[in-house]
């Protein structure tokens, strides 16, 4: 599966939105990839996550003990990707604003891959790496369905992206004129 295949799946699900959006990262964009519209279709989600699992297998020679997803956005893709990898799926969730591996215990040295939905700045992955390190895990890599940075983001561990698709995003004080006149919508899940 390549980038165009991923974009085609998002188009099939009517999941590429145009307007003025405040992303989960806090950055602004004229394009929003509404993965919830994709993830509501099990067949489309299965295709994407099977493709991601194949890329993970090609990239990581070591055995993987767990796939871990950051809640909320990483729950569905981490679960479905773990199914294709044949390993358990766990998740981290925010407690007082900080990710924790709250509902699970893992052995020290457990080899994990973080799976996220869409990466813009990589903050959720970096925070997940910190939570897993605190739990004693070895993070082999992270992976995502779509890297909006076009391969430029640094998450602190290797990032395996099913698709790299650079979509412009802006700091709130650096909006282009055409975007600044549109009302902003915040569809993300960071504060949930």
UniProtKB/Swiss-Prot annotation:
Organism domain of life: Bacteria
Listed CDD domains: PRTases_typeI
PROSITE patterns: PUR_PYR_PR_TRANSFER
Coiled-coil intervals, chain numbering: none
Keyword Thylakoid annotated: no
Cofactor names: Mg(2+)
UniProt GO BP: 'de novo' UMP biosynthetic process; pyrimidine nucleobase biosynthetic process
Catalytic activity: orotidine 5'-phosphate + diphosphate = orotate + 5-phospho-alpha-D-ribose 1-diphosphate
Keywords: Glycosyltransferase, Magnesium, Pyrimidine biosynthesis, Transferase
Pathways involved: Pyrimidine metabolism; UMP biosynthesis via de novo pathway; UMP from orotate: step 1/2
Pfam entry (one): Pribosyltran
Record InterPro entries: OPRT (IPR023031), Orotate_PRibTrfase_bac (IPR006273), PRibTrfase_dom (IPR000836), PRTase-like (IPR029057)
Annotated residues for binding of orotate: 120, 148
UniProt binding sites for 5-phospho-alpha-D-ribose 1-diphosphate: 116-124
Function: Catalyzes the transfer of a ribosyl phosphate group from 5-phosphoribose 1-diphosphate to orotate, leading to the formation of orotidine monophosphate (OMP).
Sequence similarity: Belongs to the purine/pyrimidine phosphoribosyltransferase family. PyrE subfamily.
NCBIfam families in the cross-refs: pyrE_Therm (TIGR01367)
Protein name: Orotate phosphoribosyltransferase
Organism this protein belongs to: Bartonella tribocorum (strain CIP 105476 / IBS 506)
Gene that specifies this protein: pyrE
């Amino acid at each position: 599966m390549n980038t165009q295949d991923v974009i085609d799946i998002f188009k099939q699900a009517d999941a590429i939105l145009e307007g003025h959006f405040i992303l989960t990262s806090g950055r602004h964009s004229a394009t929003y990839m509404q993965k919830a519209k994709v993830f509501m279709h099990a067949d489309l989600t299965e295709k994407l996550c099977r493709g991601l699992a194949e890329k993970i297998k090609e990239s990581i020679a070591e055995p993987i003990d767990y796939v871990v997803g950051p809640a909320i956005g990483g729950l569905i893709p981490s679960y479905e990707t773990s199914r294709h990898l044949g390993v358990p799926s766990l998740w981290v969730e925010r407690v007082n604003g900080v990710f924790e591996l709250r509902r699970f215990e893992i052995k020290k040295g457990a080899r994990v891959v973080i799976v996220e939905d869409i990466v813009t700045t990589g903050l959720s992955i970096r925070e997940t790496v910190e939570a897993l390190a605190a739990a004693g895990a070895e993070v082999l890599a992270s992976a995502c369905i779509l890297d909006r940075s076009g391969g430029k983001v640094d998450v602190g561990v290797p990032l395996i992206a099913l698709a790299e698709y650079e979509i412009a995003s802006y700091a709130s004080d650096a909006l282009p004129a055409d975007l600044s006149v549109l009302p902003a919508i915040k569809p993300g899940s960071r504060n949930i």
